[in-house]
């Protein structure tokens, strides 16, 4: 069995990696990937903590996180497709520009 500290450190590293990917990259697709990594890191923390304390709550929260990630991915990809069709780019800065 993996110690609690090792699992939580791995989850924290993955979360920081996803957060860094969201902050640094300006491409909407890479921002969605960073968000998915962050959601999976938090789900990993729930599973590790649930395994450590011997409760099934961690697995239940993992199923909830996977459901949330699927909904987020479908909405995010729909927005990504609309942005690409209208602007011919995936750069997030092009959305914030004002056109008049």
Curated annotation (Swiss-Prot):
Reaction(s) catalyzed by this protein? a quinone + NADH + 5 H(+)(in) = a quinol + NAD(+) + 4 H(+)(out)
Q: What is its EC number?
A: 7.1.1.-
What is the membrane topology noted in the UniProt record heading this document? Multi-pass membrane protein
Subcellular localization, as worded in the UniProt entry:
Cell inner membrane
Q: Which InterPro entries match?
A: NADH_UbQ_OxRdtase_chain4L/K, NUOK/Mnh_C1-like
List GO molecular-function terms, semicolon-separated: NADH:ubiquinone reductase (non-electrogenic) activity; quinone binding
Question: What is the role of the protein in this entry?
Answer: NDH-1 shuttles electrons from NADH, via FMN and iron-sulfur (Fe-S) centers, to quinones in the respiratory chain. The immediate electron acceptor for the enzyme in this species is believed to be ubiquinone. Couples the redox reaction to proton translocation (for every two electrons transferred, four hydrogen ions are translocated across the cytoplasmic membrane), and thus conserves the redox energy in a proton gradient.
Q: Which HAMAP family match?
A: NDH1_NuoK (MF_01456)
- What family, per the record? Belongs to the complex I subunit 4L family.
What's the subunit arrangement here?
A: NDH-1 is composed of 13 different subunits. Subunits NuoA, H, J, K, L, M, N constitute the membrane sector of the complex.
What is the name listed in the Swiss-Prot or TrEMBL entry for this protein? Answer: NADH-quinone oxidoreductase subunit K
Task: Give the gene symbol.
Answer: nuoK
């Amino acid at each position: 069995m993996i110690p609690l500290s090792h699992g939580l450190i791995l989850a924290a590293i993955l979360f920081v990696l996803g957060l860094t990917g969201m902050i640094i990259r300006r491409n909407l697709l890479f921002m969605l990937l960073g968000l998915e990594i962050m959601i999976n890191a938090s789900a990993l923390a729930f599973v590790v903590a649930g395994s450590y304390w011997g409760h099934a709550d961690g697995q239940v929260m993992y199923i909830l996180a996977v459901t949330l990630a699927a909904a987020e991915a479908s909405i995010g990809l729909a927005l990504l497709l609309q942005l690409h069709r209208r602007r011919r780019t995936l750069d997030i800065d092009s959305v914030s520009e004002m056109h008049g």
